[in-house]
Amino acid sequence: MKKRFWFLAGVVSVVLAIQVKNAVFIDYKVEGVSMNPTFQEGNELLVNKFSHRFKTIHRFDIVLFKGPDHKVLIKRVIGLPGETIKYKDDQLYVNGKQVAEPFLKHLKSVSAGSHVTGDFSLKDVTGTSKVPKGKYFVVGDNRIYSFDSRHFGPIREKNIVGVISDAE
């Protein structure tokens, strides 16, 4: 009788642990090369679904979000609500001020003088001069191979399903 009780208690504990894990975390497998070199295709991530609800999303946080086709994508935040965004000569400008992107150092070193990010402004790609309230402008680290806000516009905060802070 005791063995059966402990066996059932163990099974219930495992089932509950799996349910809690699935309720709190999202398993994400990186597909494609748009986040190279930060994340490689096939990397598996366990991301807290609720962390962004209790803290502010910052520039350069990496977010998981529901993309235009409702598929979960991974990209880096470069534009926050109310900001202007521009790239010129491979440099990011936010509200007219140059902002360093240390996570691109490796890509820039191997690009042999060619630009990692093509020139554009937020107005060029979205028709608006500022990132709208409640939205974020996101791009992949491997800019040449990334389908991101330059193509589908800023993402809605409500479509963010998880945040990875301080990833470089």
UniProtKB/Swiss-Prot annotation:
It is a single-pass type II membrane protein. It catalyses: Cleavage of hydrophobic, N-terminal signal or leader sequences from secreted and periplasmic proteins. Pfam families: Peptidase_S26. Its EC number is 3.4.21.89. It is found in: Cell membrane. Residues 27-168 are extracellular. Induction: Expressed constitutively. Residues 1-6 are cytoplasmic. SUPFAM superfamilies: LexA/Signal peptidase. InterPro entries: LexA/Signal_pep-like_sf, Pept_S26A_signal_pept_1, Pept_S26A_signal_pept_1_CS, Pept_S26A_signal_pept_1_Lys-AS, Pept_S26A_signal_pept_1_Ser-AS, Peptidase_S26. This is Signal peptidase I V. The gene is sipV.
